[in-house]
């Protein structure tokens, strides 16, 4: 798919730029180290962070982001993502359901969060992540309300990228009343007994 090739190229360019910025900050070999840790997959900031911890440039992943990879820091390069419309279209053409991931983590004001969800729904998004670990009950209620208002299904998620102490996979991910899980839209495989009948 041409779209995925473009996204992959954008990620690769970003990784190259991050490595160049780290090189200028006297941290050589960052791209090679991140690629080694990615094991043939897409290189992310998480791989650079693990490399920098390995090199002793920081004591933890969180420390790496504070010192090097967060917005305004030496190794920060803004991502170049596709539009919401493009991503929804590609997901739907692939037979998937488009889900707005962790909208509560974008540090948006209530006004801009409402605009984001409305825009996503207007372009035929299917669901939004309502339940996340380490989330206040108030935020979960607010996200569920937005999902209901825009007739979106709900999802749950941990935003897990690598093991870390603050993410508890599968814990505290209940959905508030009044929203339905997007997984109810998925085709359920028939068991062997049903197929034989």
Where in the sequence are the language-model features?
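Charged catalytic cores and adjacent phosphate/nucleic-acid-binding surfaces used
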Residues: 4-7, 59, 82, 86-100, ...
């Amino acid at each position: 798919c041409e779209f995925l090739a473009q996204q992959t190229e954008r990620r690769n360019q970003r990784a190259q730029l991050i490595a160049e910025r780290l090189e200028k900050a006297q941290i050589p070999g960052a791209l090679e180290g991140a690629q080694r840790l990615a094991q043939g997959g897409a290189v992310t900031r998480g791989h650079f962070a693990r490399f920098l911890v390995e090199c002793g440039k920081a004591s933890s992943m969180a420390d790496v982001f504070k010192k090097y990879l967060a917005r305004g820091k030496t190794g920060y390069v803004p991502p170049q993502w596709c539009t919401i419309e493009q991503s929804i279209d590609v997901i739907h053409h692939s037979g998937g359901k488009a889900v707005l991931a962790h909208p509560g983590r974008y540090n948006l004001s209530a006004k801009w969060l409402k605009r984001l969800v409305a825009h996503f729904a207007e372009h035929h998004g299917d669901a939004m992540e309502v339940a996340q670990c380490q989330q206040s009950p108030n935020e979960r209620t607010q996200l569920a309300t937005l999902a209901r208002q825009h007739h979106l299904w709900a999802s749950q998620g941990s935003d897990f990228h690598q093991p870390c102490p603050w993410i508890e996979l599968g814990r505290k991910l209940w959905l508030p009343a009044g929203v339905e899980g997007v997984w109810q839209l998925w085709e359920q495989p028939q068991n062997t007994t049903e197929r034989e009948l």
